[in-house]
Curated annotation (Swiss-Prot):
Protein name, as recorded: DNA replication and repair protein RecF
GO biological process: DNA replication; DNA synthesis involved in DNA repair; double-strand break repair; SOS response
Record organism: Francisella tularensis subsp. holarctica (strain LVS)
GO MF annotations, alphabetized: ATP binding; single-stranded DNA binding
Binding residues for ATP: 30-37
Primary localization: cytoplasm
GO cellular component, one term: cytoplasm
Domain of life: Bacteria
InterPro entries according to UniProt: DNA-binding_RecF (IPR001238), DNA-binding_RecF_CS (IPR018078), P-loop_NTPase (IPR027417), RecF/RecN/SMC_N (IPR003395), RecF_2 (IPR042174)
UniProt family annotation: Belongs to the RecF family.
Subcellular location: Cytoplasm
Protein purpose: The RecF protein is involved in DNA metabolism; it is required for DNA replication and normal SOS inducibility. RecF binds preferentially to single-stranded, linear DNA. It also seems to bind ATP.
Length: 349
């Protein structure tokens, strides 16, 4: 997948603009407030039907307008068009090849995105749910049945929590547990299948950033590895019932990062943590591209302020190997001069 043209109308501070891009590394250069990050945000919005900058979607609409529109022409390898519009206090309207979509799933499948921005580096210190999203992203693209299993599992956990809060009889909880265990086992299998591919790739790429970094990367499924979920739920029922929430299950899955059994945030410097996240993002893209004809697109916001020049160069070289389309923002052109080659495209705004 690559985007050849992007048109924005009333998206943040961009009233109406059309941009052409190359299927290579695209540098977006401009001062703070010029709209660089808004371009990345609009592409991300097209893929995910949400923003990575704000949950207040009305604020994304230009203050002089009542609606924003995002439109793109892309190739996969055939030409496709994707558009998304939103009016104030209304829902998103998504179109794929001019056809309105009931949900955004097909567009997300057509437009795989990896985002690297300053907030990406917080994943190590975030909760398990955020780290598990790394696995779920990859499993979604690796296995077309994953989404339905994930949705059903999420529904059953929510249903169980609701039953606990409303003091439903234990027999009713058991009926939910039976279904939950069935879907949880399938979900765990699919997550494990993706993690098995991801783990060695992270180690491989991280060694190019810093061969001296040693760490352990493990997948925790959300309950005791040596017990069935049914057994764990039965044993923990009194505790769950006391606090009115399900404390074990696939919703508690996590990627555990450690060094000699100590949390990585207690061992790695902030700079080393950034290298790990870059390796993680590159590993996801490489696995995706090897399993799909539809290559992943990278959105990278102001990376030169996050990494030194040596590690930034390593990141760029890996991105070139992936042959993915890349969008990179920067405030100063001189910061990227050493990374520009004949295939690069520079957009100054």
């Amino acid at each position: 997948m690559y985007i050849s043209n992007l048109r924005l109308q009333n998206f943040r501070n961009i009233p109406a603009k059309s941009f052409d891009f190359k299927n290579s590394i695209n540098f977006i250069v401009g001062k703070n407030g010029s709209g660089k990050t808004s371009i990345l945000e609009s592409i991300y919005f097209l893929s995910h039907s949400r923003s990575f900058r704000s949950s207040q979607l009305n604020r994304i609409i230009n203050h002089n307008a009542d609606e924003f529109i995002i439109y793109t022409k892309a190739y996969n390898p055939d030409e496709i068009t994707i558009s998304l519009s939103r009016k104030k206090n209304s829902n998103n309207i998504s179109k794929l090849n001019l056809e309105i979509q009931k949900n955004h799933t097909e567009i997300t499948r057509n437009l795989p995105i990896q985002l690297i921005n300053p907030e990406s580096f917080n994943i190590i210190n975030s909760g398990a749910q955020q780290r598990c999203k790394v696995i779920d992203w990859g499993a979604f693209y690796l296995d077309k049945t994953f989404l339905k299993i994930w949705q059903q599992t999420k529904f059953l956990v929510k249903q169980r929590n609701s039953a606990l809060k409303q003091n439903y009889p234990y027999s009713y909880i058991l009926s939910i547990d039976k279904k939950l265990c069935e879907f949880a086992e399938i979900l765990d299998y699919k997550r494990q299948a993706y993690f098995t591919k991801l783990k060695p790739k992270i180690y491989e790429i991280l060694s190019h950033f810093n061969p001296n970094l040693q760490l352990d990367i493990d997948y925790f499924r959300g309950w005791n590895l040596h017990k069935s979920l049914a057994q764990v739920l039965e044993e923990s029922f009194n505790y769950d019932n006391k606090y009115k929430v399900t404390n074990h299950g696939p919703h508690k899955a996590d990627i555990v990062l450690s060094v000699s059994h100590k949390p990585i945030q207690d061992i790695f410097s902030r700079g080393q943590q950034k290298l790990l996240i870059c390796a993680l993002k590159l590993a996801q893209g490489e696995i995706h591209n090897s399993e799909n004809d539809n290559k992943c697109i990278y959105l990278i916001d102001d990376i030169t302020s996050e990494l030194d020049s040596i590690h930034t160069l390593t990141l760029f070289n890996y991105l070139k190997q992936l042959k993915s389309q890349v969008f990179i923002t920067t405030t100063e052109k001189n910061k990227i001069n050493e990374f520009i080659d004949t295939n690069s495209y520079i957009l100054e705004i």
